[in-house]
């Protein structure tokens, strides 16, 4: 059964010849990992699936590794310099501290809010403390 929900891309790593395993933080399912086929090469599909991408995830499967049907990027958080490193730290915290399939809508909302504030140029220390 196909499912759809908002998701933030946390981490991407190559898998086999042209695929990737992607860690997503979703509002309803928490952190989930999925296989994106046709990720590398000339495909435009891989361009949208990058860390700091927020969008709509469509997938199927209920195992620990879902099959991603599509990911439509609604917003890419463009971070630079120290803000980029802080953003990577935030994504790493989500990857390591949120259990797989653990529903955490407040954490998802806080992460998106923090990245939005960081992108807007608000004080970095305050953004991270609020998270």
Task: Tell where the protein language model's regions lie, with residue ranges.
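Non-catalytic alpha-helical scaffolds and adjoining flexible linkers that form interface surfaces
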Residues: 1-131
